[in-house]
């Protein structure tokens, strides 16, 4: 599924060592896994968090919608017999995964979510996530649904601009969308470098810029293709339903859109009055979470030096109260209204 920008740095024997778990010490400190506990790793990826949780003595239900990640995790499953359950699924359905493994109505002691694309996926050109390596313009975490090429070549110009603007915070969104529309009529975009080079040619590149001109467009396409913001919103609500009182929800994000969603969620789940200064109070909402850490926790300078991909990482965490879950309300996340990918699939 949506795995980390890090991952496990102890791959199967003979594999290339590429994956470094991000904020691992901070995650374990916030999650506090102990022997006998059951923790859900909703974004298994290369298994960096799962391994540390298992080493701390807790059992893990690990979820990923990428079948490649699940298959790679079989070696770890053998290393920890009876303590690791791998489930191929979207992490928004983590409550269903827990029911499948532990039985209907089962609760868990912790949930960890690492929101972003795995370095394992970025590093494999054939997955189509990277603008630095040539590959098919795909970007799907699984092989289901429309690809990034489908989006680029088939969506209306205005819809593309909105996706680049809202999901990538790209200031040249309109110009890039119009360029794509003009070019795709004669020659559709099918390769990552083709799109990246076209964007760079259009907007130029200042030598002082730290990021490639295509970075935000590629981010927006990946987030849209995989419905990453919707997945995150539904996963947070699902975690609230399956955590025991005292259970911990730990979320690591890598860009501001996701961090704002998590911050807004924990603030909403702190409860309080349902009224406002304009309307009388209707009822008091009892908190479903209390803070496990103060604000957002970022990487140390040493980690940033060791792993540049950790620079933008932020960790937020909450502790489940004894109160019932609050209402499932996706509107609290402020998600932008964008075209449905299933409509694209039917077009």
UniProtKB/Swiss-Prot annotation:
GO molecular function ontology, one term from the record: rRNA (cytosine-N4-)-methyltransferase activity
Gene3D superfamilies listed in its UniProt record: Putative methyltransferase TM0872, insert domain (1.10.150.170), Vaccinia Virus protein VP39 (3.40.50.150)
Reaction equation(s) it catalyzes: cytidine(1402) in 16S rRNA + S-adenosyl-L-methionine = N(4)-methylcytidine(1402) in 16S rRNA + S-adenosyl-L-homocysteine + H(+)
EC number: 2.1.1.199
Binding site for S-adenosyl-L-methionine: 47-49, 64, 91, 114, 121
Keyword Transferase annotated: yes
Keywords: Cytoplasm, Methyltransferase, rRNA processing, S-adenosyl-L-methionine, Transferase
Highest taxon above the source species: Bacteria
Disordered as annotated region, ranges: 291-347
GO biological process, one term: rRNA base methylation
EC class name: transferase
Cellular localization per UniProt: Cytoplasm
GO cellular component: cytoplasm
Keyword Transferase: yes
Record family assignment: Belongs to the methyltransferase superfamily. RsmH family.
Role: Specifically methylates the N4 position of cytidine in position 1402 (C1402) of 16S rRNA.
Protein name: Ribosomal RNA small subunit methyltransferase H
Organism field: Brucella anthropi (strain ATCC 49188 / DSM 6882 / CCUG 24695 / JCM 21032 / LMG 3331 / NBRC 15819 / NCTC 12168 / Alc 37)
Phylogenetic classification of the source organism: Bacteria, Pseudomonadati, Pseudomonadota, Alphaproteobacteria, Hyphomicrobiales
